[in-house]
Design a protein with these regions (language model features):
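C-terminal PAP-associated
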Residues: 25-523
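Bacterial N-terminal signal peptides that target proteins for export
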Residues: 1-11
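Bacterial N-terminal signal peptides
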Residues: 9-21
């Protein structure tokens, strides 16, 4: 494949200093998880352009080789415009249209290390130039068992205001922006990259299974791509999210909004479209070609959109989600949590019901919800072993199956946040040696937060906690916060020696991507 050379800003290779030499330490009291057990520092972003929603992967062939990507959005537009409230007012709508029409307003920043995080090289995507689009947002990264690194994004909005030729909805999102999600591959540890390849291009119904009716409006059905890898088979998957049309539904044309200039349309009302899905596509040749697009739920057992988990190992694509419809012949009462296994890249699933959490583990009152979807991880060392994590108030409980979902262990307490805190940015993954790791942000009532990690070395029976953040992050800073978009997730990876975390943090005075590293010996 044709290669392009990663652009290194000023050919920079930097030596990162300990955090204490960069930022004054907080006077926080001692907390579980000694600060000295983790290493952390600001990696991506600056006062002009933030960096959020980061991804981290290590190279299985060379664990000292890691890639981090982040969505890097201008904090102030070239004309000096700063963020305003994102609401449905006329002015906010017009401001959003203006923001999205700025070329290179959002890009994917890339950091690569080949010495375990001592030094890094920095570059940015070439997707915007290659496809002639404004933005490379919703960044992601990945790594394959053959040592290949991957990076990609949602590359969209025809250059300048071209993405708005088909109009926009109230709120400012283009109806037909152009673009989609794309991926590039590196076979030399991130030194050079292939040209990007479309995975979920917009307006491409021919790529979907014939029984699916995806709704092609705005960035649906390709929003927020996520990368999944089956290390035993080398299969890689990329997801996208968005709406769908009911079986017999006919989508009516958008209706002009009289409060907006020509080209501005009313938002669609609830019920005008069908359900919301996570769409998934598989590649068996390292991202060169891709198969038919399916969903992570099914017509027989529909999900609720966001909130489910996806993982893969030993040729099994596995999903977990909440449904209101019990699988056929299950005799279950729903809403319930289902576990699905696909042997054909998501074309079809076999389902099993996961027992509900016992009543004595549930809080007496719901309290603050936080982000409480079910997490799922497949163990690459043992076929049929999977872990799920469920939130019950201030606690997370983990259950394990050793037989492909037929039976599940009793829930084990894995994490707990303070009484007034909620969970955010949760993640869970197995290491190549079968060690189970988890991360989460603990978010406090004043919107400050810190990052935590948890590890089980005995198959999910006992857990040990290490605080990754050395201090609590200030709350979101609107004028230096990725233009008020770009903090939907944090991610982790776990090798045989270290747990790695990347997350958006505001301690530097802007939303930047911070990198954390914890030796497994610390747990």
């Amino acid at each position: 494949m044709k290669q392009f050379r990663a652009y290194l800003a000023f050919a920079t290779v930097v030596m990162l200093l300990p955090l204490g030499q960069l930022i004054a330490q907080s006077s926080l009291p001692a907390l579980p998880g000694d600060n000295a057990k983790s290493d952390e520092y600001l990696l991506l972003g600056n006062a002009d352009r933030g960096a959020g929603e980061p991804w981290v992967f290590f190279n299985p062939r060379d664990p000292n080789n890691l890639i981090v990507t982040a969505m890097a959005t201008l904090n102030v537009l070239p004309d000096g415009e700063t963020p305003v409230a994102h609401d449905n007012s006329v002015q906010a709508t017009l401001n959003r249209v203006h923001e999205l029409s700025v070329p290179d307003g959002s890009r994917t920043d890339i950091a690569v290390t080949r010495d375990g995080g001592k030094t890094w090289t920095f570059s940015e995507d070439n997707f915007r130039k290659f496809y002639n689009k404004n933005r490379c947002s919703d960044s992601f990264a990945g790594a394959g068992p053959d040592g290949a690194l991957y990076m990609g994004c949602l590359v969209y909005l025809d250059r300048g205001d071209g993405g708005f030729k088909g109009g926009y909805f109230r709120g400012g999102e283009a109806i037909n922006p152009g673009g989609g999600s794309a991926i590039a591959r590196s076979d030399d540890e991130g030194k050079t990259w292939s040209n990007p390849v479309w995975v979920h291009p917009l307006k491409s119904p021919e790529l979907y299974a014939p029984w699916l009716r995806p709704l092609f409006e705005q960035v649906g059905p390709v929003d927020r791509p996520n990368f999944i890898v089956d290390a035993s088979k080398g299969t890689i998957y990329l997801t996208g999210t968005g709406g769908s049309l009911g079986k017999d539904a006919v989508l009516a044309p958008p209706v002009h909004d009289p409060e907006l200039p020509d080209g501005g349309y009313k938002r669609r009302e609830a019920g005008q479209t069908g359900g919301f899905h996570t769409y998934i596509r598989a590649s068996h040749d390292g991202g060169k070609t891709w198969g038919i697009i399916y969903t992570t739920d099914s017509e027989q057992v529909p999900g609720r959109g966001f909130g489910g988990g996806v993982s893969a190992a030993f040729g099994h694509l596995v999903v977990v989600y909440t449904t209101d419809t019990a699988p056929p012949s299950s005799n279950a009462t729903c809403p319930c949590t289902v576990f699905g296994i696909s042997e054909n890249d998501g074309k079809s699933y076999s389902y099993k019901i996961i027992p509900a959490l016992p009543a004595n583990l549930l809080p007496p009152s719901p309290g603050p919800a936080g982000r409480a979807g079910v997490l799922l991880a497949a163990d690459p060392t043992k076929e049929g072993r999977y872990a799920i994590a469920r939130t019950a108030g201030r606690r997370q409980y983990v259950s394990i199956t050793e037989d492909g979902g037929n039976t599940w262990s009793a829930p084990v307490l894995a994490t707990e946040v303070p009484e007034t805190a909620t969970y955010s940015h949760r993640g869970m993954k197995y290491s190549p040696a079968g060690v189970l790791g988890m991360i989460y942000k603990a978010q406090y009532p004043d919107r400050t937060f810190d990052m935590w990690s948890v590890v089980s070395k005995d198959g999910g029976h006992n857990f040990s906690t290490v605080r990754v953040s050395h201090a609590v992050s200030p709350a979101y800073i609107p004028v230096r916060g990725n233009f008020m978009y770009g903090d939907d997730l944090s991610t982790m990876d776990i090798s045989r020696e270290y747990l790695y975390v990347v997350w958006g943090d505001n301690r530097s005075g802007f939303e930047g991507t911070w990198f954390g590293k914890v030796p497994l010996s610390a747990y």
